[in-house]
């Protein structure tokens, strides 16, 4: 059983949670999110707190889904209240990014420009041509799109060129040593 899931999720002011059938929906100032619930968990809303507990009819490992749904609901609450943001930085000569309509256009040292469609529900902005900011209310969608952008040109260990998360540490390797010895 998850230790964190024993505590209730406290709802900030302006956030509402409703449960209908097997679906939970969270509404807040930034938008609304829904999640289908598994039969292994029971959700109870009391005042401004949400409680996640294992279902009574589950005999085999009753708390295995409790922590998962606690985290999913907590992320939904945080997303509709504050939102999520991932920032990526591009390091390399000639590396640039720009937003054109619903596409993120990347110039990352290949012969053709790379265009990535921006998923609905995300807001992408580019600062100083090399700093990409991805914002949204769905933590999974923000992280997944940021990972897809990073995967187009991950940082390489010798010169550090590529796309990396802001403040990400890239372990550097020493280059090949010069050949010494007999001529």
Swiss-Prot record:
GO biological process, one term: cytoplasmic translation
Tree of life domain: Bacteria
InterPro entries named in the record: Ribosomal_uL6-like, Ribosomal_uL6-like_a/b-dom_sf, Ribosomal_uL6_a/b-dom, Ribosomal_uL6_bac-type, Ribosomal_uL6_CS
A Pfam family this chain is assigned to: Ribosomal_L6
Any single GO CC term annotated in Swiss-Prot or TrEMBL for this entry: cytosolic large ribosomal subunit
GO molecular function, one term: rRNA binding
Alphabetical UniProt keywords: Ribonucleoprotein, Ribosomal protein, RNA-binding, rRNA-binding
Subunit-level organization: Part of the 50S ribosomal subunit.
The protein's role, per its UniProt record: This protein binds to the 23S rRNA, and is important in its secondary structure. It is located near the subunit interface in the base of the L7/L12 stalk, and near the tRNA binding site of the peptidyltransferase center.
Family of the protein in this entry: Belongs to the universal ribosomal protein uL6 family.
Name used for this protein in its record: Large ribosomal subunit protein uL6
Organism the protein comes from: Chlamydia muridarum (strain MoPn / Nigg)
Gene: rplF
């Amino acid at each position: 059983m998850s230790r964190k899931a024993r505590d209730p999720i406290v709802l900030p002011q302006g956030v509402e949670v409703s449960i209908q059938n097997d679906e939970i929906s969270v509404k807040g100032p930034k938008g609304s999110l829904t999640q289908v619930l598994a039969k292994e968990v029971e959700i109870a809303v009391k005042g401004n707190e949400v409680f996640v507990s294992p279902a009574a009819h589950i005999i085999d490992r009753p708390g295995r889904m409790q922590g998962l749904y606690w985290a999913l609901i907590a992320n939904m609450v945080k997303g509709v209240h504050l939102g999520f943001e991932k920032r990526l930085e591009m390091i390399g000569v000639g590396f640039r990014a720009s937003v054109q309509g619903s596409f993120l256009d990347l110039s990352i040292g290949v012969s053709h420009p790379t265009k990535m469609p921006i998923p609905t529900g995300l807001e992408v902005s580019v600062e100083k041509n090399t700093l990409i900011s991805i914002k949204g209310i769905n933590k999974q969608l923000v992280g997944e799109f940021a990972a897809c952008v990073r995967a187009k040109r991950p940082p390489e260990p010798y010169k550090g060129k590529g796309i990396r998360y802001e403040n990400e540490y890239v372990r550097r390797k020493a280059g090949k040593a010069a050949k010494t010895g007999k001529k």
